[in-house]
């Protein structure tokens, strides 16, 4: 990109020349000056202190060329084993909630790059939007985050390994990855805690989504964790330390199947939130929280037969929380898998569709695969991951 200027026009600082309100991450300029017909070029960093071009009395400013940075973040999706629903404020404001979850090696990738048209914003996801004003963006998370950071002249793109609405916390992985990226783009340092809290602020406080807090913290921290939600609103993340043998068994024997029927979690969660005031629903959530600590114990011991049983108990409780969590097809799939040898399982996410997870002993894999194939459920390979959201590329 090149911007031409009248060589006789008075100029002040480089920031004023480019019209930037804040420094960009690792932004560099090549500045070319004419001095008695000889061009002198030098590299300067925009983040350095302002320089008054007028003090260079014998020089004439010619052209600025942008060599801007590209930043890419990689943020994992999550699988929640037990406790889902207790991360809603309607529950944890009255009694501590908890979930036990892991992130997996499927990711949301967010890239940012300076946009050619400095007075516009371009966002590419399942659609492409190019707007003059951030308020014109249709994507609510992009609109909220970019407005919050007051950035313009930026191009944001997203690519995901898994589609949204499938029960793996894709919206929160998007939000965490976007916050991580834009903080880097604007030269702000972040922690895992600030990413989790920031994503909750965007999705729950600013956008008013009727969702819980587990997905945001899972994506930010990564790994196998108990995530606790306290009545004062604070969140605590406790890693679950398991042996390499247990981790290998989980990676080998956790079976994931895509059953289709992508859905919006918001409707089901809104009903679940409303139902929390009912005594039987509240007690079901209390039992699910208890299962979190039971599951931690069996994982630490390496008792994975009991792990499957606890998944089954959690699924029975979860179905009672709201209509729409399960469907006749989901019930048929669950019955087919358990009859073929699965020790236990669950539907991922709020309910209605997406992915089903089962724990299956090695000698029963082919039987369960065959049973699920008969009902048009597609196996999906994955492994547990440990890193959480991270920056994987910076190009100056």
Where are these regions (language model features)?
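Short, often N-terminal, low-complexity regions
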Residues: 3, 10, 18, 22-24, ...
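N-terminal basic, low-structured, amphipathic or hydrophobic segments
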Residues: 4, 38, 46-51, 61
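Short, Lys/Arg-enriched N-terminal segments with co-localized hydrophobic residues
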Residues: 52-69
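C-terminal nucleotide
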Residues: 70-80, 87-90, 99-101, 105-150, ...
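DPxDG-like acidic metal-binding loop motif
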Residues: 168-192, 220
């Amino acid at each position: 990109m090149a911007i031409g200027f009248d060589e006789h026009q008075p100029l002040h600082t480089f920031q004023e020349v480019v019209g930037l309100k804040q420094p960009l991450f690792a932004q560099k300029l090549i500045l070319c000056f004419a001095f008695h017909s000889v061009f002198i070029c030098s590299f300067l960093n925009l983040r350095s202190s302002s320089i008054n071009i007028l003090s260079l009395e014998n020089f004439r400013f010619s052209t600025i060329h942008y060599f801007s940075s590209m930043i890419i973040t990689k943020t994992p999706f999550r699988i929640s084993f037990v406790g889902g629903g207790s991360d809603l404020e309607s529950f944890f404001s009255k009694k501590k909630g908890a979930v036990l979850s892991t992130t997996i090696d499927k990711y949301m990738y967010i890239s940012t790059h300076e946009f050619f048209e400095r007075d516009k914003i371009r966002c590419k996801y399942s659609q492409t939007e190019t707007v003059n004003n951030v308020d014109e963006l249709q994507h609510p998370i992009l609109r909220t985050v970019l407005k919050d950071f007051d950035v313009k002249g930026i191009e944001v793109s997203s690519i995901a390994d898994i589609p949204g609405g499938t029960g793996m916390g894709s919206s929160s992985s998007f939000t965490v990855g976007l916050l991580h990226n834009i903080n880097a783009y604007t030269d702000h340092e972040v922690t895992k805690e600030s990413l989790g809290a920031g994503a909750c602020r965007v999705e729950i406080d600013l956008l008013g989504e009727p969702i819980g807090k587990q997905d945001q913290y899972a994506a930010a921290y990564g790994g196998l964790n108990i995530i606790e939600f306290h009545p004062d609103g604070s969140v605590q993340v406790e890693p679950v330390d398991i042996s390499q043998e247990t981790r290998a068994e989980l990676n080998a024997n956790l079976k994931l199947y895509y059953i289709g029927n992508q859905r919006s979690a918001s409707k089901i969660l809104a009903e679940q939130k409303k139902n929390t005031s009912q005594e039987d629903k509240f007690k079901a959530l209390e039992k699910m929280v208890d299962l979190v600590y039971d599951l931690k114990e069996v994982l630490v011991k390496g008792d994975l037969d009991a792990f499957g049983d606890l998944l089954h108990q959690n699924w029975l409780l979860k179905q009672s929380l709201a209509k729409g969590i399960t469907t006749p097809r989901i019930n048929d799939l669950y019955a087919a898998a358990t009859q073929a040898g699965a020790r236990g399982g669950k539907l991922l996410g709020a309910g209605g569709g997406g992915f089903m997870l089962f724990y299956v002993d090695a000698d029963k894999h082919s039987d369960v695969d065959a049973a699920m194939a008969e009902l048009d459920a597609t196996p999906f390979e994955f492994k547990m991951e440990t890193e959480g959201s991270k920056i994987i590329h910076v190009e100056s």
